[in-house]
Design a protein with these regions (language model features):
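Sec-dependent, cleavable N-terminal signal peptides
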Residues: 1-21
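Short acidic-hydrophobic catalytic motif
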Residues: 70, 101, 174
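Intrinsically disordered, low-complexity segments enriched in Gly and acidic/Ser/Thr residues
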Residues: 151-202
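Extended intrinsically disordered, low-complexity coil regions enriched in Ser, Thr, Gly, Ala
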Residues: 72, 78-92, 122-130, 179-196, ...
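A cross-kingdom feature marking solvent-exposed beta-strand/loop segments within repeated
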Residues: 80-112, 186-216
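A short, polar beta-strand/turn micro-motif
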Residues: 17-67, 75-79, 106-172, 212-236
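Residue-level detector of intrinsically disordered/flexible regions characterized by low predicted structural confidence
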Residues: 4-5, 60, 90, 164, ...
């Protein structure tokens, strides 16, 4: 099986604060990003929007800000398609995300539940803010690999993340969680009536039902042979 090699895992939620603005639940969340690579996804979206502006992924003042903190987005083959670096006064720039090659400022919206690779030479805090998405998130998964995650600011049970009825459900839809060396530590497969099972996530090797908590903002590697939709529950 093809593996995506990374060197770290996503930092867990350090703090989350909520408020109420009109009908929107708004707030912010602080995550500690470890040294090395990690998989993550934003837990808020911009108020009145359907995603979060990448410039609202704020790194703390302790960030090196000299192009050694970067975000990468991947295609269905696990290859990097976009790479942005965090620059600040240490690079003579206003704090923000810039193009890796040109250092030009960038505009990018990250839609709910889309994950990314974060790379940092040292641990650093990241703050995301905005509104909590109301209602569940339904997101398309292409054939091949994709990075998806828990886009709510709360921990959720993996079994609450569902695949659409069109899923093959015969062990060809799978989720992997990775360790600090980029090796798979947990692998779960989606089974349904096509495998003679109740729809849900099961151990890859034994097909035993599993109990696993996906942390707020934690992302994972998903692999499928055919496009399918994933449904992530609402935090509200």
């Amino acid at each position: 099986m093809k593996k995506l090699m990374i060197a770290g895992v996503a930092g867990l939620c350090a703090a989350v604060t909520f408020g109420l603005e009109s009908a929107n639940v708004v707030g912010y969340q602080t995550k500690t990003i470890p040294a090395g690579f990690s998989l993550s996804t934003p837990t808020f979206q911009d108020i009145g929007a359907e995603g979060l502006d990448l410039q609202n992924f704020k790194l703390a003042d302790t960030a090196a800000g000299d192009s050694t903190e970067m975000i990468q987005f991947l295609d269905a083959d696990g290859q990097c398609t976009e790479m942005w670096v965090w620059l600040n006064a240490n690079a003579g720039m206003e704090p923000g995300w810039y193009d890796f090659n040109t250092w030009a400022p960038i505009v990018k919206t990250v839609v709910p539940a889309v994950g990314y690779l974060m790379n940092s030479v040292s641990p650093v805090d990241m703050v995301v803010s905005g509104q909590v998405k109301s209602g569940e998130t339904t997101i398309a998964l292409p054939a091949g690999f994709s990075v998806r995650g828990n886009n709510t600011p709360a921990d959720i049970d993996l079994q609450s993340i569902k695949l659409a009825d069109t899923a093959a459900g015969d062990s060809t839809d799978m989720i992997q969680f990775l360790d600090a060396d980029g090796q798979c530590t947990e692998m779960w497969v989606w089974l349904n009536a096509n495998a003679g099972m109740e729809p849900g996530w099961y151990d890859f090797n034994t097909w035993a039902p599993i109990d696993y908590t996906v942390k707020a903002g934690e992302a994972f590697l998903f692999n499928t042979v055919s496009p399918v939709e994933m449904i992530i529950p609402s935090a509200l």
